[in-house]
């Protein structure tokens, strides 16, 4: 049974901007290198030093639109005139090979991937310890004006946090390493669920028969 390939799981991280999603994912992958990222598809031009299929899959606007129409792109967003999306085939092939995936997606993106892979996806919502702390973290990033920060906080309160009931787990990101360990504990528990290990368990001789 040790040689059997267990189907991988998809851990999807969502939450308000500034709650620390990227830091949590990076810390989790550093502690557990068996976690894998998903290569996204984009309409952005390839840059020097980038490789097809490693950094992104590069498509024209027409090709991207076709992938949306055919359902191959599960979710997508637009930034600075370029589209970025998640490929269904990219996820399917990796979890079939036993790879455990971790993704940072918008709330609508998380719900879309969960709908496409209901038995394989686990959704985790990240909360800040307080709204005041969320504001502080957004200010610390030095990326946005005060008006933009207020808009992000307002969006978190009115649109994002109310969606928390659609997620499987909720983690409050106060101390990064604690949140990382909680996330890894969630992934470990999900790996050990019976429905994810039925084929392996069926190969074990647990009848206890004696001659």
Regions found by a protein language model. Name each.
Residues 22-72:
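N-terminal phosphate/diphosphate-binding loop that engages ATP/GTP or pyrophosphate donors
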């Amino acid at each position: 049974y040790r040689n059997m390939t267990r189907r991988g799981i998809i851990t999807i991280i969502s939450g308000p901007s500034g709650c620390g999603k990227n830091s949590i994912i990076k810390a989790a992958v550093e502690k557990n290198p068996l976690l894998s990222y998903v290569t996204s598809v984009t309409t952005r031009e390839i840059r020097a030093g980038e490789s097809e299929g490693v950094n992104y899959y590069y498509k024209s606007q027409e090709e991207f639109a076709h992938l949306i129409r055919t359902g191959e792109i599960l979710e997508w967003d637009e930034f600075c005139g370029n589209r970025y999306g998640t490929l269904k085939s990219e996820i399917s092939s990796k979890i079939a090979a036993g790879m455990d995936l971790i993704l940072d997606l918008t709330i609508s993106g998380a719900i879309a991937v969960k709908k496409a892979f209901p038995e394989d996806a686990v959704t985790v919502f990240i909360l800040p310890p307080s709204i005041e702390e969320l504001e502080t973290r957004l200010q610390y990033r030095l990326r946005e004006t005060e008006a933009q920060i207020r808009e992000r906080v307002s969006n978190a309160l009115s649109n994002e946090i109310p969606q928390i009931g659609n997620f499987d787990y909720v983690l409050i990101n106060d101390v990064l390493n604690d949140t990382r360990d909680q996330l890894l504990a969630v992934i470990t528990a999900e790996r050990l669920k019976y429905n994810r290990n039925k084929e392996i368990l069926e190969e074990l001789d647990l009848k206890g028969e004696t001659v």
